[in-house]
Amino acid sequence: MKAWEIWTWQGHPCVLVSNQRRLDRKERVVVLKCQTLYAGDPLPRENEALLDEADGLDRRTVCACDLLYTAPKKDLKQRRGVVTFDRRRDISRKIIQGLAIAGL
C-alpha cells in the first residue's frame, strides 16, 4: 500500500492519506471516505474533492476532506487507482482548511 492510492473500504472508494511510514508499519491507517456520483447528485462542496477516470476510477467520485477515518489495513480491498498530483495538492489544502484545528 502506498500513500494516495485509492482502495475499497466498506463498499466505497477511499484515499490513503497516512504518511508512508505509517502505511508500512501500522495495522490501522488514515483514509478519506469517498462516494461515487450519479446523475442528479449534487456537485461537490468546497470541502470535497472530485476524483475521476484520471485517478483510475470508473466514475466521478467525491471525497469529503474534512472528516478523516481510521481503517484497518486488512479491511482495505481492491486497489482502484492513484490520486493525480494536482488533486493531491487540492485534497491536502482542503484537509487543512476543513479541520481548522482549534481555529488555527
Q: Where are the regions that the model predicts?
A:
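Conserved functional hotspots at enzyme active or ligand-binding sites that engage polyanionic ligands
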Residues: 1-104
